[in-house]
């Protein structure tokens, strides 16, 4: 919570002004019972109309002052809370952007979304309520007790005894409610996870008729959220009857003792009225506590969740550029890597080298470590053992930012952003000109297809490029990587949806490009054009060589070849 509230520091002056205005409003409210007592004792009971007019005018003036202070307090409280919300979301987003793949995986995507939206909103609401009401309520209680004792010690004593009992009860509710609302936020994460998965996989769900199954899954998670939320709210709502019961008993005792004191002549009517007035105002302040407790406990749970992200060790941001363009030489020396919280190594003792402008094809079954190998090159992960060299320099000695600026990476899962085709291609390079965008599209063999669309490069894509075919999305992703003019190009099964003719044109265009290309593929037709082929199995590099070398020396490669071309194909080679 403390970490989250650090974003309030720039607005401490404005928050201070809001508090002063709130105290002004509170002071006026605490003075009103005393003025009413004056009007009753010195005006009404003595039939002195002048006192009624004088103190009545003072009350009206103070009420106007209180109204103005309240309006300004609301303005500053809203400004501070909204500014806090903006800065916190910005800080959280920047923090998440600094995470490596392994650090990012500590929380689920839906959990990040909940923390950036719902959790920040909960703390924002608490800040607004603190500057507007949350601090005012306890101050009203304390001020009401003190002034009640100042008016009449005997009658004020009833409040002095009752209020601490209620405060102890409220502290118990606060502690119990905090645990419940933390559980509510976790259940909300689970609901958000299911919603996110369903929105992403809606086509698959409809195609396989799994809608009813997913509805049941959602209802189950949503029911658990509802049950936990109801439990939390029931606890909070339980406080109101208890508060009202004890405070009403206290007011009855004050009335009973006050009437006895008035009869005996030891107390004036105005004093009893003033203390009853303070008691009702304190009751009003206490009646807000269930609502304030709910806000605070939810904000406390949310603030702790925000703090978890902010306190997570981010990866050291290695800013900087590389003075010269990389030649693209890559060397792996006995590299091993295991994902966090996984027992089995994803890569084990892998060694190979790629010369500048070479094309390396990587083959292997699912889970053999192909994509993992790619992710080590731009330092998305760090190897557990072994060394990786780029241009004969240890990769960890090259600034991460400068290294990644010279790498074009097309991941296995195509991801297009909302916006136009032009914006999606230009996303790979800031301030890219239209000519650069079109050149990259031509290399990726997508230029002619784009021109056939109604709005050409200004065609707006649906969510995740839903209005494009798989092959079109892959080629736009490749164009986005090529616009960077990379020294190293990593294609993670990025041509799987292309027909053989289009893929051949694409690879031929890339071969004229001055970059080292590593391509993960399942197609022998793609691999056989490469300068070198790496064959991975269960995280180990078991074979490497050219197409003809592997076809004659590797039984596994030969089986893959025959599965695609038949036994006659391998014999003819």
From Swiss-Prot:
Any GO molecular function: ATP hydrolysis activity
Domain of life where this protein originates: Bacteria
Any one annotated GO CC term: plasma membrane
Sequence positions that bind ATP: 364-371
Compartments, record wording: Cell membrane
Record-annotated ABC transmembrane type-1 domain positions: 15-298
Keyword DNA damage annotated: no
Biological process, per Gene Ontology: transmembrane transport
PROSITE patterns reported in the protein's UniProt record: ABC_TM1F (PS50929), ABC_TRANSPORTER_1 (PS00211), ABC_TRANSPORTER_2 (PS50893)
SMART domains assigned: AAA
Transmembrane segments: 17-37, 52-72, 127-147, 153-173, 238-258, 275-295
Pfam families reported for this sequence: ABC_membrane (PF00664), ABC_tran (PF00005)
Membrane topology: Multi-pass membrane protein
InterPro entries found in the cross-reference section: AAA+_ATPase, ABC1_TM_dom, ABC1_TM_sf, ABC_transporter-like_ATP-bd, ABC_transporter-like_CS, P-loop_NTPase, Type_1_exporter
Keywords on record: ATP-binding, Cell membrane, Membrane, Nucleotide-binding, Transmembrane, Transmembrane helix, Transport
CDD domains (alphabetical): ABC_6TM_Tm287_like (cd18548)
Domain (ABC transporter) ranges: 330-563
Main location as per UniProt: membrane
Family: Belongs to the ABC transporter superfamily.
PANTHER family (alphabetical): ATP-BINDING CASSETTE SUB-FAMILY B MEMBER 10, MITOCHONDRIAL, ATP-DEPENDENT PERMEASE MDL1, MITOCHONDRIAL
Name of this chain's protein: Uncharacterized ABC transporter ATP-binding protein YfiB
């Amino acid at each position: 919570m403390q970490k989250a509230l650090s974003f309030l520091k720039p607005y401490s002056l404005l928050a201070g002004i809001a508090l002063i205005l709130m105290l002004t409003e509170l002071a006026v409210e605490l003075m009103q019972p005393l003025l009413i007592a004056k009007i009753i004792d010195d005006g009404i009971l003595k039939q002195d109309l002048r006192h009624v007019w004088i103190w009545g005018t003072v009350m009206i003036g103070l009420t106007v002052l209180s109204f103005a202070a309240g309006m300004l307090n609301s303005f500053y409280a809203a400004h501070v809370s909204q500014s806090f919300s903006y800065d916190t979301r910005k800080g959280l987003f920047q923090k998440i952007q600094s995470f490596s793949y392994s650090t990012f995986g500590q929380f689920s995507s839906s959990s990040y979304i909940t923390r950036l939206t719902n959790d920040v909103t909960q703390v924002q609401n608490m800040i607004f309520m603190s500057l507007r009401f949350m601090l005012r309520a306890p101050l009203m209680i304390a001020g009401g007790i003190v002034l009640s004792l100042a008016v009449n010690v005997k009658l004020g004593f009833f409040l002095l005894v009752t209020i601490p009992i209620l405060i102890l009860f409220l502290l118990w509710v606060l502690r119990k409610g905090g645990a419940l609302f933390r559980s509510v936020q976790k259940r909300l994460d689970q609901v958000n996870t299911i919603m996110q998965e369903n929105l992403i996989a809606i086509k698959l769900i409809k195609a396989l008729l799994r809608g009813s199954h997913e509805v049941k899954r959602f209802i189950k998670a949503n029911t658990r959220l509802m049950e936990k939320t109801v439990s939390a709210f029931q606890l909070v709502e339980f406080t109101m009857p208890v508060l009202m019961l004890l405070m009403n008993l206290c007011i009855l005792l004050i009335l009973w003792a006050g009437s006895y004191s008035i009869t005996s002549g030891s107390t004036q009517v105005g004093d009893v009225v003033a203390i009853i007035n303070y008691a009702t105002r304190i009751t009003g302040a206490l009646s807000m506590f269930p609502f304030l407790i709910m806000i605070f406990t939810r904000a406390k749970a949310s603030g702790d969740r925000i703090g978890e992200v902010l306190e997570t060790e981010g990866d050291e941001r290695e800013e900087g550029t590389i003075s010269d363009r990389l030649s693209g030489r890559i060397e792996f020396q006995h590299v091993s890597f295991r994902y966090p919280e996984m027992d089995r190594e994803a890569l084990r003792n892998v060694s190979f080298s790629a010369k500048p402008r070479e094309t390396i094809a990587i083959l292997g079954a699912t889970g053999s470590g192909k994509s993992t190998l790619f992710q080590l090159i731009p330092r998305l992960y760090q190897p557990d053992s072994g060394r990786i060299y780029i241009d004969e320099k240890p990769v960890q000695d090259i600034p991460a930012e400068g290294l990644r600026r010279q790498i074009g990476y097309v991941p296995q899962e195509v991801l297009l952003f909302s916006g136009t085709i032009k914006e999606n291609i230009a996303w790979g390079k800031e301030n890219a000109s239209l000519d650069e965008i079109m050149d990259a599209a031509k290399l990726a063999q997508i230029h002619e297809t784009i021109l056939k669309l109604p709005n050409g490069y200004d065609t707006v894509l649906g969510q995740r490029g839903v209005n494009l075919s798989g092959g079109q999305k892959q080629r736009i992703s490749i164009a986005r990587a090529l616009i960077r003019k990379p020294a190293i190009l990593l294609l993670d099964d990025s041509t799987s949806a292309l027909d053989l003719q289009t893929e051949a044109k694409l690879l031929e265009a890339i071969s004229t490009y001055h970059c080292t290309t590593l391509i993960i593929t399942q197609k022998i037709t793609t691999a056989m054009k490469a300068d070198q082929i790496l064959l991975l199995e269960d995280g180990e590099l078991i074979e490497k060589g050219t197409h003809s070398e592997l076809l004659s020396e590797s039984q596994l490669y030969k089986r893959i070849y025959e599965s695609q071309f038949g036994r006659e194909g391998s014999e003819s080679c």
